[in-house]
Amino acid sequence: MNMRTDPALLANPQLSFATVASGICIPYIERGTGEPVIFVHGSLCDYRYWDAQIAPLSAHFRCIAPSLSHYWPAAEACIQNEFGWQEHVAELAEFIVAMDLAPVHLVGHSRGGSIAFQLAREYPRLVKTLTLADPGGPLQLDGMREASLPSAMNALRAKVAGMIEEGVVEPGLELFVDSVSVPGAWKKSTDAFRTMAIDNASTLPKQFLDPLPAYSRDTASQIACRTLLIDGQKSPRMFRNNVESLEGWIYLAERATITGASHGMNVANPAAFNRMLRSFIDY
């Protein structure tokens, strides 16, 4: 099954691998007992992104954080499908079934929020509650012809992809991370975050060739479970617009804002994020 496995991957005693129905291998970490909570990472991240949630919340729930295919360490250790949001939705659904977890409390951040949203739409029986933190993707407002990201953002992404493909990795990552958070975010980030982002840099050009689907009134009306929408007070307007619209479109939605935080609100203020999430799940 393994293609090119770095022994360091196996150094984490909590790291496990699940083989799902399609034959691919999904790395994940798991801690705690109780109702299952699955954490879905976003761009440049993997299961490590949720460290500040897994440890404290595992005292109350069965916390599981997978790495989606092509993200570390799956890129080194696992058989994978093609890169794409649809593939990630399908493999995550297969993971929930293979692990006999349904229904789960599903938590997604940024691009992972889009994956979680689409999974809840397509596989409603697998999801008990849905939490979307700064969900990524374009917004299809009523009366608009076609939803897409702003042209300036697409131009920036093309530049970032070119830099990474040419080996100018850290400056490219800095440009992207600052664009989805606040200027200077990359330089202020922790060594652990920068290491994780560098480990996953090769996924970014692939991601830019695979646009996320738009949120719309129609698609949001198909979410049947209780939903918590979290944004950061200082998150870029695109994410806050998504949260604001989804709050009005999803029938059983509630919204919470983390004061002083930007896009990585669960890392910047984990105590507030964890408190909101636990209160919502325990309701």
What are these regions (language model features)?
Residues 261-274:
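Catalytic histidine-centered segment of alpha/beta-hydrolase-like enzymes
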Residues 217-261:
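Conserved loop-alpha-helix segment in the C-terminal half of the alpha/beta-hydrolase fold
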Residues 165-205:
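Conserved alpha/beta-hydrolase catalytic His-Asp/Glu region
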Residues 108, 112, 116:
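Gly/Ala-rich beta-loop-alpha elbow adjacent to hydrolase catalytic centers
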Residues 117, 121-164:
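Flexible "cap/lid" loop of the alpha/beta hydrolase fold
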Residues 17-81, 95:
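Conserved HGGG/HGGXW glycine-rich cap/lid loop of the alpha/beta-hydrolase fold
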Residues 106-108, 133:
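Short beta-strand immediately N-terminal to the catalytic nucleophile in serine-hydrolase-like folds
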